[in-house]
Amino acid sequence: MVATNRCCVFALLVALLLIHSLAEAGKGKEVLGKIKNKLVEVKEKIKAGWDKLTSKSEYACPVIDKFCEDHCAAKNAIGKCDDFKCQCLNS
């Protein structure tokens, strides 16, 4: 008898959760849309920050220099960052 009552209570809770989920589905689309818009804004801010950073050679060259050194080391060459372009010089 007790198990039957617990089962009914559980079924009732599941039904209420299902109804609530269906009712909130429309609102969920709005929330997901807002989240997507915020993520797009964050992506654009990060991209703008990176572009600003790389436009200043004194800040960007160390980052590019390290990439260039690693890239050229794989080719058994010496990497040199020149005007934001990686040049592999034969050693």
UniProtKB/Swiss-Prot annotation:
Lineage start: Eukaryota, Metazoa, Ecdysozoa, Arthropoda, Chelicerata
This protein's UniProt keywords: Antibiotic, Antimicrobial, Disulfide bond, Ion channel impairing toxin, Neurotoxin, Potassium channel impairing toxin, Secreted, Signal, Toxin
An example Gene Ontology biological process: defense response to bacterium
Disulfide-bond pairs as recorded: C61-C81, C68-C86, C72-C88
Protein name per the record: Potassium channel toxin TdiKIK
Job description of the protein: The full peptide presents antibacterial and cytotoxic activities. The synthetic C-terminus (AA 33-76) inhibits voltage-gated potassium channels Kv1.1/KCNA1, Kv1.2/KCNA2, and Kv1.3/KCNA3.
Domain of life: Eukaryota
Domain BetaSPN-type CS-alpha/beta: 58-91
Keyword Disulfide bond: yes
Keyword DNA-binding: no
